[in-house]
Amino acid sequence: MAVNYETKATNTGGRNGHVQTDDKAIDVAIVPPAQADAEKGTNPEQLFAAGYASCFNGAFDLILKQNKVRGAEPEVTLTVRLEDDPEAESPKLSVSIDAKVKNVLSQEEAEKYLQDAHEFCPYSKATRGNIEVDLNVAVVD
């Protein structure tokens, strides 16, 4: 299988440490979720939310363009939750994907294209069957 892209990140210190990508595009302090703020650092959940939101919106935009939908201007907000797992000793993740598109298409079309994006998105593929994912889309003015 051909590799289209590869990147590396190295962490020291776990959730009280530091992470840096090999190209230094990301070079940040890592702190536990309760301590995260712009001055102290970020956490793995924020990084996951940022990556998944960006990847998913790219997939959604591509699906819209493939279906000749113009002017939809998709926006995706991804919420990552770190929650107790009653079946395990460690916590688990769940996510909500909340998308908005301009009213150049119907709610039914927006939901179909959102689902198509979920099938296409590499992050969605990687998490499928592993975490709960809620999909929501709103058609706005």
Curated annotation (Swiss-Prot):
Region of interest: Disordered: 1-20
Gene Ontology biological process terms from the UniProt entry: response to oxidative stress
InterPro entries named among the record's database cross-references: KH_dom-like_a/b, OHR, OsmC/Ohr_fam, OsmC/Ohrsf
Entry similarity comment: Belongs to the OsmC/Ohr family.
Protein's name according to its UniProt entry: Organic hydroperoxide resistance protein-like 1
Naturally occurring in which organism (per UniProt): Staphylococcus saprophyticus subsp. saprophyticus (strain ATCC 15305 / DSM 20229 / NCIMB 8711 / NCTC 7292 / S-41)
Organism lineage string: Bacteria, Bacillati, Bacillota, Bacilli, Bacillales
